[in-house]
Amino acid sequence: RYPYTGVLGILSAEDHEKVRSAMELVHAWDLKDRDFSAVSDGQRQRILLARAICQEPEVIVLDEPTSFLDIRHKLELLSILKEMVRKQHVAVLMSLHELDLAQKVSDLVICVHGDRIERCGVPEEIFTDEYIRQLYGVTAGSYNASFGCLEMEPARGKPEVFVIAGGGSGIPVFRQLQRQGIPFATGVLQENDVDYQV
């Protein structure tokens, strides 16, 4: 809040309230008396986000904000950011390498390859198997746009197992067989069946 404090850098009651509100928003108020160097990386991420929020910015730029966060805190953080965009009209620019999160949370995606912008568009235009393969140079496996995840390449060779699947019942079996390197076949699946996509 120091940009708002004047020459002497004295925090007013309003400044203290803004800091408290920002820390509560990111679930970091319980860390207020802890030494910053003694908290976990995930807790540091939340504290730094609170620091940015209490400045009341029009734009927040975040570099890998979900790094070091567990699943719960990733979801909380992304929900907080989406709420800020909707309610406070803050523009959030962030770099993410987690394609599944970027696909679900972004309004607009800018893909950077090397030192240049490769492509820009809405998630539905960007997150396709063909484009993700091209962007990352993926030669084995595939990108499943429906699930927002990478799929391992199936084991090659004559199928040793036939999996009777459908309605998602085959996915855990497919993945277990892939992990074990066992070639398999499945059927009969409709193209709109979730098992077909995997």
Where are these regions (language model features)?
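Conserved ABC ATPase signature
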Residues: 9-11, 35-39, 43
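Hydrophobic anchor residue at the start of the ABC signature
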Residues: 49
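ABC ATPase nucleotide-binding domains
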Residues: 137-197
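Conserved catalytic motifs of ABC-family nucleotide-binding domains
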Residues: 56
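Helical segment within the ABC ATPase nucleotide-binding domain
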Residues: 75-87
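Conserved ABC ATPase "signature" region
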Residues: 13-32
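Catalytic Walker B motif of ABC-type/P-loop ATPase nucleotide-binding domains
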Residues: 60-64
